[in-house]
Amino acid sequence: MKNKFKSVAESFFRIFIVRYFFRMLIKLGSGCGRVWTFAKVRALVDIPKGSNCHWSVVFKYPENIHFSGRVMLSPGCVIGAMSPVSFGNEVRLSQGVHLETASLDVNGDLPYKHIAKPITIGDGVWIGAHSIILGGVSIGKNSVIGAGVVVSKSIPENSIVVGPGFRFIERKEKY
């Protein structure tokens, strides 16, 4: 109970500081978008030291995003984490990559309800530009996802996946 209270208190403090800082930036005028985004990312998402995170990266539900080690998040990435998203060490997301844990339950009544499944990305994974990773997917360590691939099912370790047909082109040799 004590740890939960501490966690809630820390989150509240971070959000309070970010909002206060945001008001200060509004007073400063235009051109402060980068500073605001950097402050927002650092306050709401616990990114490990040595990581690179472009200021244009969008985090939805940042409390569900967990990093195990260094990551590189390129411009235009969107991480929608209604359910947990876990990153391994030395993970690279190229420009415009989307990770989305939520989808709609179209079998139910209107309005459709959101359902969310976790995403797990292993160590040493490289995801190519403009790829989309959907909920319920686990990407094994040392895998490479080519540009523009929509990943809707799990990928084993040491795999290379390319093309719109989700083709495994080869298994990488272990290091």
What are these regions (language model features)?
Residues 56-67, 72-138, 164-166, 170-175:
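Flexible, glycine/small-residue-enriched loop-and-beta-strand segment within the central core
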